[in-house]
UniProtKB/Swiss-Prot annotation:
It is found in: Cell membrane. Residues 108-178, 236-239, 286-300, 389-1236 are cytoplasmic. This is Calcium-activated potassium channel subunit alpha-1. The keyword Cell membrane applies. It comes from Homo sapiens. Changing C118A: Decreased localization to the plasma membrane. Abolishes localization to the plasma membrane.
Length: 1236
């Protein structure tokens, strides 16, 4: 045996030596791919089998030729010396495993079926015997089963528990199962990678398991696969179907050959490519890891995994057969192809290109290609287009926002269009703001069009867009809403259904607040009544910065203020809009208008140098020295509540850390109020030099601040001032311990400052700056802040109005109120309206029908019925329009006095003449049908036609004079019988209007470009921005688009919105909104000291310079002198001019149109025809002499043309002598009787 073995080895060795070069052949024929002839093949088979079973000599078989060796042989690897193929052994291991197991399963099922049938028959016989033998107990229960049955039940239970345990182990519902599934998939991919590495070696080769690292890793992987296969087998309910699964087949043809490789010390590449089929489970794995969440992504990964796994598997089969050859051809027709060349071949085959550079030579390969083309072509034609479609339809903006450290971001959603986004960005990123270190993230469910995408790219450093919906929590997480500084929701101002748009925005608020209750939300609302729904959201808190910008409320509020002071809507709109300064050299009206347009509203904390000074003093100092206009402050009351006080008067002293509201052209200019230091900047004349100084400002105690303020009031030095006695100081110490920042007790420290003030000129000396203009209080100011109780003021008409049985104001005391009236009682016919002889009233032309959306006329009427007007000062309001529409609005209007309705149409000149439109103080043109038209250029057709219709009307001058004289009404505070003794001066008496062009009109527009059709004498270009057009500058046109700037202004300073709403709504508060949300109407209330105190708040008015106490300044005087005089004498705060358009021209016949000049400089020259915008204090005594006259007539009109819109100022002497003489009262009574 030894010799034989040696001889065999020797011949083999000799063959190896002689054929050494043949083992490493050329690239055409691989050494292990040489084929044998038929006889040598059979000899090789018998020789290989005999050598593998024993070491006997091979004398009985023919030795193969040297060129017939197949497997490379080395001395280190114990392998078959003859180099014969053993592929059949590897394949046989897989086939035996598969078919053997299948046979066992089928045999088991057959035996189980037979056993079940037999036992079923036997069980029926046994059960029948038990019933016949009476085996049941007396109580009807069966006897206990025998011990054998208990053992069977226990055995079944044990098997079931093992099966359940195995199911839990492989289930993806548990953490262990998910980890195991992911691990199996990862190891399968690892085994596939090992296959890719081994594919560069021959198909079959000798390998030493102990030295081959890849074989060892592959062996470890397959041991794990075997264990996992066992778990799956145990957990499977149907073993047969489990055996035929794709994953099971993969294990059959990949796991057993590895063990054969270890036994035979040789490797066969074989069917290991089947591991690529595991890629089909890739989408499931990603779902387990919570990576794939959308249906499109799951579908895309499924298609890709199926396509790639099929492709790689087919390439592996072609690689096997082409490198091996056909068995019936003795493996002689093989060709050397790498695996990746086979991958390439399969791709060009599936795509039907077939370049021919690589093709199959073996019969098995070509046969496989025939069938693969049928399936592969179908798969390629269906899968590839679908994959491309899914990839193409993927959201371009579907990523997630990555927050930048140290940089805030806001989320903007809602109505995202090119117009809304461009308007928002233009104002938000304006250069006049300080460096805006805020990133804007837009979230919308529709991808942007090309224009909007280009806009985003232009602002790519500060703007990002993501496609999604705020109603989806996943999308909210993508934009990091929880870390956002605020969320802004834009509304579609031009939608056909405003209520539906508001409902959408409310749902957005609910979704955002539900995801993150602490996020600050600023949303636009179209309808005022829909704001009440926001109060139902538990996490909605306006005190924490949540704000709802109601466009209808503000739009109609602006228009209402224009009825009181024409042009105010333009001025206020320009103040909170960021406009760049446009310099014009020519001396035209546009030059002065644009200088005012560059002003905006800013806030800044006041310097400690202002602490203890009164508001008028600080206001004058800021205007004269700092070139700043301060109109309001944020005041902290004794109970630490913050309130915004507009021109509060000189009874209020500035506290430490007071926030001021300024009108300025740049945010840097407002810093002067914070940097101002009396010690360092008192002698500086150039405000630009006022910068932060280096001196340390000691914090004064409350006693020192009060003593300083006291000395300012009395005009003495602190050493000589005796106002602050020791007892007062002791009381102040107690007060300081209770309220460290409160300084209200300083209100009573001075009594003789009035005389001193009148004797001294206006300078910047602290002793001479302090002005005293009477006791005034803001609507939100606590009564504790008033110097005197308003009920104790001599001559106060509120004493007479304190009737506990009469309700004249609403429950908050902010608005005039009357008992609800039926609409029939206020309807006027055309003849009744003509006989009423209306004058000084407001005509509201409204277009609408029964199907039109409500515009909320209550928001127009409420500012005109504010309680800081006396009853006789209220302008009568006449609505001209469809009675069907007005009936729908009447529910919110029936509690307001002096309201009438003329059914008709604003296009009817007869209706307009019946309401004396030529004698009105203002004509308002509104339309509720604007959003029902698709063509934007036609949305304003009704308003434009009505405006042109009124302007083309002609009126008889004699008729107007007769009507004015027959009316017999006197303006507020003026007695016609004794004009010399009248306390009113400065009344602007204008001639009667003979043409409609001179009628004051304000027209609401939807489309900004339609403003070009209102004035025929202007030269505005159609592309001119709205604020640059003549109708807007003159205050005769208003568009809701100007309110877009409020979103940015509110974000940067939430107090701005409160200030604007206080100015334009007449005093609407969150408490009032909550009350209206409950009843949808104002509730009447009895007069109390608290509600009557709310009347004491300032209001916007226009001051005439043609006559009165300021007439001397009207002819060439300086605006700054007027500002200081009005402030110190009447506590009136001037902030703009309403000037004739051609005032700068020396033409005899000037145009009657006026334009707005905002915050002119100190040295600005005045002309006599100017009207001054001012914040006027409430006068308690102005309505005393008119109270009985005004309330005795329900429909009387108490102001002549322009008398109530152009206010006059009581003189100082007459303020001290309020009670009218008996002669004056008798003359008033005579006028009243004559009128009746």
């Amino acid at each position: 045996m030894a010799n034989g073995g040696g001889g065999g080895g020797g011949s083999s060795g000799g063959g190896g030596g002689g054929g050494g070069s043949s083992l490493r052949m050329s690239s055409n024929i691989h050494a292990n791919h040489l084929s044998l002839d038929a006889s040598s093949s059979s000899s090789s088979s018998s020789s290989s089998s005999s050598s593998s079973s024993s070491s006997s000599s091979s004398s009985s078989v023919h030795e193969p030729k040297m060129d017939a060796l197949i497997i490379p042989v080395t001395m280190e690897v114990p392998c078959d010396s003859r180099g014969q193929r053993m592929w059949w052994a590897f394949l046989a291991s897989s086939m035996v495993t598969f078919f053997g197991g299948l046979f066992i399963i089928l045999l088991w099922r057959t035996l189980k079926y037979l056993w079940t049938v037999c036992c079923h028959c036997g069980g029926k016989t046994k059960e029948a015997q038990k019933i016949n033998n009476g085996s049941s107990q007396a109580d009807g229960t069966l006897k206990p089963v025998d011990e054998k049955e208990e053992a069977v039940a226990a055995e079944v239970g044990w098997m079931t528990s093992v099966k359940d345990w195995a199911g839990v182990m492989i289930s993806a519902q548990t953490l262990t199962g998910r980890v195991l599934v992911v691990l199996v998939f990862a190891l399968s991919i690892g085994a596939l990678v090992i296959y890719f590495i081994d594919s560069s070696n021959p198909i079959e080769s000798c390998q030493n398991f102990y030295k081959d690292f890849t074989l060892q890793i592959d062996m470890a992987f397959n041991v794990f696969f075997l264990l996992y296969f066992g778990l799956r087998f145990i957990a499977a309910n149907d073993k047969l179907w489990f055996w035929l699964e794709v994953n099971s087949v993969v294990d059959f043809f990949t796991v057993p050959p590895v063990f054969v490789s270890v036994y035979l010390n040789r490797s066969w590449l074989g069917l290991r490519f089947l591991r690529a089929l595991r890629l089909i489970q890739f989408s499931e794995i990603l779902q387990f890891l919570n990576i794939l969440k959308t249906s499109n992504s799951i579908k895309l990964v499924n298609l890709l995994s199926i396509f790639i796994s099929t492709w790689l598997t087919a390439a592996g089969f072609i690689h096997l057969v082409e490198n091996s050859g056909d068995p019936w051809e003795n493996f002689q027709n093989n060709q050397a192809l790498t695996y990746w060349e086979c991958v390439y071949l399969l791709m060009v085959t599936m795509s039907t290109v077939g370049y021919g550079d690589v093709y199959a030579k073996t019969t098995l390969g070509r046969l496989f290609m025939v069938f693969f083309i049928l399936g592969g072509l179908a798969m390629f034609a269906s899968y590839v287009p679908e994959i491309i479609e899914l990839i193409g339809n993927r959201k371009k903006y579907g990523g997630s926002y990555s927050a930048v450290s140290g940089r805030k971001h806001i989320v903007v959603c809602g109505h995202i269009t090119l117009e809304s986004v461009s308007n928002f960005l233009k104002d938000f990123l304006h250069k006049d703001r300080d460096d805006v270190n805020v990133e804007i993230v837009f979230l919308h469910n529709i991808s942007p069009n090309l224009e909007l995408e280009a806009l985003f790219k232009r602002h790519f450093t500060q703007v990002e867009f993501y496609q999604g919906s705020v109603l989806n929590p996943h999308d909210l997480a993508r934009v990091k809403i929880e870390s956002a500084d605020a969320c802004l929701i834009l509304a579609n101002k031009y939608c056909a259904d405003p209520d539906a748009e508001d409902a959408s925005n409310i749902m957005r608020v609910i979704s955002i607040k539900n995801y993150h209750p602490k996020i600050r939300i600023i949303t636009q609302m179209l309808q005022y009544h829909n704001k009440a729904h926001l109060l139902n959201i538990p996490s909605w808190n306006w005190k924490e910065g949540d704000d709802a910008i109601c466009l209808a409320e503000l739009k109609l509020g602006f228009i209402a203020q224009s009825c009181l002071a024409q042009g105010l809507s333009t001025m206020l709109a320009n103040l909170f809009s960021m406009r760049s300064f446009i310099k014009i050299e020519e001396d035209t009206w546009q030059k002065y208008y644009l200088e005012g347009v560059s002003n905006e509203m800013y806030t800044e904390y006041l310097s400690s140098a202002f602490v203890g000074l009164s508001f008028p003093t600080v206001c004058e100092l800021c205007f004269v020295k700092l070139k700043l206009l301060m109109i309001a402050i944020e005041y902290k009351s004794a109970n630490r509540e913050s309130r915004i006080l507009i021109n509060p008067g000189n009874h209020l002293k500035i506290q430490e850390g007071t926030l001021g509201f300024f009108i300025a052209s740049d945010a840097k200019e407002v810093k002067r109020a914070f940097f101002y230091c009396k010690a360092c900047h008192d002698d500086i004349t150039d405000p630009k030099r006022i910068k932060k100084c280096g001196c340390k400002r000691p914090k004064m105690s409350i006693y020192k601040r009060m003593r300083r303020a006291c000395c300012f009031d009395c005009g003495r030095s602190e050493r000589d001032c005796s106002c602050m006695s020791g007892r007062v100081r002791g009381n102040v110490d107690t007060l300081e311990r209770a309220f460290p920042l409160s300084s209200v007790s300083v209100n009573d420290c001075s009594t003789s400052f009035r005389a001193f003030e009148d004797e001294q000129p206006s300078t910047l000396s602290p002793k001479k700056k302090q002005r005293n203009g009477g006791m005034r209080n803001s609507p939100n100011t606590s009564p504790k802040l008033m110097r005197h109780d308003p009920l104790l003021i001599p001559g106060n008409d509120q004493i007479d109005n304190m009737d506990s049985n009469v309700k004249k104001y609403d429950s908050t005391g902010m608005f005039h109120w009357c008992a609800p009236k039926e609409i029939e009682k206020v309807i006027l016919t055309r003849s009744e309206a003509a006989m009423t002889v209306l004058s000084g009233h407001v005509v509201v032309c409204i277009f609408g029908d029964v199907s039109s959306a409500l515009i909320g006329l209550r928001n127009l009427v409420m500012p005109l019925r504010a309680s800081n007007f006396h009853y006789h000062e209220l302008k009568h309001i006449v609505f001209v329009g469809s009675i069907e529409y007005l009936k729908r609005e009447w529910e919110t209007l029936h509690n307001f006095p002096k309201v009438s309705i003329l059914p008709g149409t604003p296009l009817s000149r007869a209706d307009l003449r019946a309401v004396n439109i030529n004698l009105c103080d203002m004509c308002v043109i509104l339309s509720a049908n604007q959003n029902n038209i698709d063509d934007t250029s036609l949305q304003d057709k009704e308003c434009i036609l009505a405006s042109l219709n009124i302007k083309s009307m002609q009126f008889d001058d004699s008729i107007g004079v007769l009507q004015a004289n027959s009316q017999g009404f006197t303006p507020p505070g003026m007695d016609r019988s004794s004009p010399d003794n009248s306390p009113v001066h400065g009344m602007l008496r204008q001639p009667s209007i003979t043409t409609g062009v001179n009628i004051p009109i304000i027209t609401e527009l939807v489309n900004d470009t339609n403003v070009q059709f209102l004035d025929q004498d202007d030269d505005d270009d159609p592309d001119t921005e709205l604020y640059l057009t003549q109708p807007f500058a003159c205050g005769t046109a208003f568009a809701v688009s100007v309110l877009d700037s409020l979103m940015s202004a509110t974000y940067f300073n939430d107090n701005i919105l409160t200030l604007i709403r206080t100015l334009v709504t007449g005093g609407a508060t969150p408490e009032l909104e909550a009350l209206i949300a409950e009843e949808n109407a104002l509730r009447g209330g009895y007069s109390t000291p608290q509600t009557l105190a709310n009347r004491d708040r300032c209001r916007v008015a226009q001051l005439a310079l043609l006559d009165g106490p300021f007439a001397d300044l009207g002819d060439g005087g300086c605006y700054g002198d007027l500002f200081c005089k009005a402030l110190k004498t009447y506590n009136m705060l001037c902030f703009g001019i309403y000037r004739l358009r051609d005032a700068h021209l020396s033409t005899p016949s000037q145009c009657t149109k006026r334009y707005v000049i905002t915050n002119p400089p100190y040295e600005f020259e005045l002309v006599p025809t100017d009207l001054i915008f001012c914040l006027m204090q409430f006068d308690h005594n102005a309505g005393q002499s008119r109270a009985s006259l005004s309330h005795s007539s329900h429909s009387s009109q108490s102001s002549s043309k322009k008398s109530s819109s152009v206010h006059s100022i009581p003189s100082t002497a007459n303020r001290q002598n309020r009670p009218k003489s008996r002669e004056s009262r008798d003359k008033q009574k005579y006028v009243q009787e004559e009128r009746l």
